């Protein structure tokens, strides 16, 4: 089934909306109420994404599953540790998948950026390595913040710090993308010579 490309504002709303809900419910009530609201908002965002685009991004689906699992543990056991460690699990998982893919000469970042860029195999490898390092760094940063700062500070960082950091990192990759960008005809020749790392 063909995927409909969503409007950038819609994509931003489905990604940032649940975090904003999480932040404001935590400010108004507490972390446990915010966790429940976050779970509902995540599910609503997935449904909206599928209704509009007939497609659910892999990263969004993985994130939602982890949120629901750790959110449920948080509420059932009434222990905020689970929801706080959730980002560490997600970032660590992404870093492991991307890094592990490189070991087997597969660039899974090419799947994440499907149809957005046409890069040479070398370009995909470098970009994948950088994103693996970024996710690993974010996992470490989340651990440091939730273990050393207040819950409100952690919630604020999660809601309003993670996205800017991700955007800054993504923008910083543009020189690499421009350097290794190729038109489709040249890319086919390059893939034949080096092997398409996105497909193994």
Curated annotation (Swiss-Prot):
The keyword Transmembrane helix applies. It holds the Pfam family IspA. The chain crosses the membrane at residues 7-27, 32-52, 56-76, 93-113, 126-146, 153-173. GO terms for cellular component: plasma membrane. InterPro entries: YciB (IPR006008). It is a multi-pass membrane protein. Its main location: membrane. Keywords: Cell inner membrane, Cell membrane, Membrane, Transmembrane, Transmembrane helix. The keyword Cell membrane applies. Belongs to the YciB family. HAMAP family: YciB. Plays a role in cell envelope biogenesis, maintenance of cell envelope integrity and membrane homeostasis. This is Inner membrane-spanning protein YciB. It comes from Bradyrhizobium sp. (strain ORS 278).
